[in-house]
């Protein structure tokens, strides 16, 4: 049974691009950068992968052509598993290159989402294959909960790559991922400090006040300007905080997903915070 979209509307901008564009425009008017993501994952058919590539190319052109975005750095966020990663890495890399050629033409950045741990190495392999040709227009996501991220951070700092750092929302076994949130926060802050020291324009993707304040303090103590990195949050969460931080002079990016395949993303948001579950329950009661 397909659940009604209104349940996810707090976290997903719309089921179509046209439904999502007014959301993007409103965020931009408030001085917030946007990363637009077409929801979907794990494509196993070549024609579907090619169609996903073409959708991403259209997203680049759509965002690049929006009015009122002067001084903002809108971008798209993509999943390589939608472009054939699980079919053939070379096929996926070719699709990504075609997308990045268009992105470079429009000077628009493409963020490579990090999915489950089974795709981590493949994602980084493909990233490193294309990065030398598009150093200003592509960067990966790293998850603080994964034990391997320590060495991945070192590698990205060596390259000077823009990284989106998040805690990680996928269920992973204790053999490869930290399970204790206190430990994950400690790793997150360590990785944040290394990224701020050695990369430009990395994204500190967190809603955690302790991590936000610690990041601000570290940047101040080391004379790292607010224009040298950005905070990132998800659409529908901490909306007042997003605007307040932008007003305080910080770069604030909002990750804005859309599409009909919203249920996996919606489920991950519910697992993350009990407040999200209460929001959905209230919506059901009101409905």
Model-predicted regions and their roles:
Residues 1-287:
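Positively charged, amphipathic and often flexible ligand-engagement surfaces
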């Amino acid at each position: 049974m397909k659940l009604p979209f209104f349940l996810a509307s707090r976290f997903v901008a719309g089921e179509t691009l046209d439904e999502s564009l007014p959301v993007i425009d409103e965020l931009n008017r408030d001085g917030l950068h946007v990363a637009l993501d077409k929801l979907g994952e794990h494509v196993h058919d070549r024609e579907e992968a090619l169609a996903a590539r073409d959708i991403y190319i259209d997203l680049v052109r759509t965002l690049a052509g929006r009015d009122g975005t002067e001084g903002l750095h809108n971008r798209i966020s993509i999943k390589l598993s939608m472009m054939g990663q699980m079919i053939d890495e070379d096929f996926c890399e070719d699709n990504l290159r075609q997308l990045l050629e268009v992105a470079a033409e429009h000077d628009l950045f493409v963020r490579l989402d990090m999915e489950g741990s089974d795709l981590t190495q493949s994602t980084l392999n493909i990233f490193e294959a294309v990065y030398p040709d598009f150093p200003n227009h592509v960067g990966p996501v790293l998850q603080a909960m994964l034990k391997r991220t320590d060495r991945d951070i070192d590698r990205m700092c060596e390259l000077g790559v823009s990284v989106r750092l998040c805690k990680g929302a996928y269920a992973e076994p204790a053999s490869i991922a930290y399970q204790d949130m206190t430990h994950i926060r400690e790793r997150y802050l360590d990785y944040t400090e290394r990224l701020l020291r050695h990369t430009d324009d990395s994204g500190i993707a967190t809603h955690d006040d302790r991590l936000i304040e610690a990041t601000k303090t570290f940047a101040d103590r080391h004379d790292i300007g607010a224009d040298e990195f950005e905070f990132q949050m998800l659409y529908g969460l901490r909306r007042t905080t997003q605007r307040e931080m932008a007003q305080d002079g910080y770069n604030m990016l909002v990750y804005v997903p859309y599409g009909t395949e919203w249920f996996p993303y919606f489920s991950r948001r519910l697992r993350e915070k009990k407040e999200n579950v209460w929001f959905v329950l209230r919506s059901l009661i009101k409905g």
